[in-house]
Amino acid sequence: MATVYDVPGDLLVERVAQRLKEIPEIKPPEWAPFVKTGRHKERLPEQEDWWYYRVASILRRVYLDGPVGIERLRTYYGGRKNRGHAPERFYKAGGSIIRKALQQLEAAGFVEKVPGKGRVITPKGRSFLDKIATELKKELEEIIPELKKY
């Protein structure tokens, strides 16, 4: 059985985002169409369903790095801000988006909070991601036969 480590992250996040749309606990808040994802961004996300992609990416990040807190995720999703003539500077991403996404993942049972440490993935969340990774790896093996070695 393949794990998250065995497949490309971008393809996995895309597939997980499609599956998360079917889960009733995970839905974008009413303010989601109007917000930037951080201070460093100039514009809103272009995709209509960007919320599901961010939640899928956070779920993958908790799987890989857990236990992980909101501040570490803010740093991961942050970036450099263009300040005109002034030198660029790193700014963290917005915390509300990450906080609400983690709360929705907790409600769905994919993530749980460990006091003093942060969020970790639950067995249900690990199984959810590993099943999708296994399906994705089988599809990739048909396209790229060299992947059967792994």
Swiss-Prot record:
Tell me which Pfam families the record gives: Ribosomal_S19e
Any GO molecular function: structural constituent of ribosome
SMART domains annotated for this entry?
Answer: Ribosomal_S19e (SM01413)
Q: Which InterPro entries match?
A: Ribosomal_eS19, Ribosomal_eS19_archaeal, Ribosomal_eS19_CS, WH-like_DNA-bd_sf, WH_DNA-bd_sf
Highest rank taxon of the organism = Archaea
Which SUPFAM superfamilies would you find in this protein's record?
Answer: Winged helix' DNA-binding domain (SSF46785)
**Would you kindly state one Gene Ontology biological process term found in this protein's UniProt entry?**
translation
What Gene Ontology cellular component terms go with this record? cytosolic small ribosomal subunit
The alphabetical list of record keywords is: Ribonucleoprotein, Ribosomal protein
Gene3D superfamilies referenced in this protein's UniProt entry, alphabetically: Winged helix-like DNA-binding domain superfamily/Winged helix DNA-binding domain
Instruction: Give a yes or no for keyword Ribosomal protein in this entry.
Output: yes
Query: What assembly does the database describe for this protein?
Result: Part of the 30S ribosomal subunit.
Role of this protein:
May be involved in maturation of the 30S ribosomal subunit.
**Similarity remark:** Belongs to the eukaryotic ribosomal protein eS19 family.
What is this protein identified as? Small ribosomal subunit protein eS19
Native species: Pyrococcus abyssi (strain GE5 / Orsay)
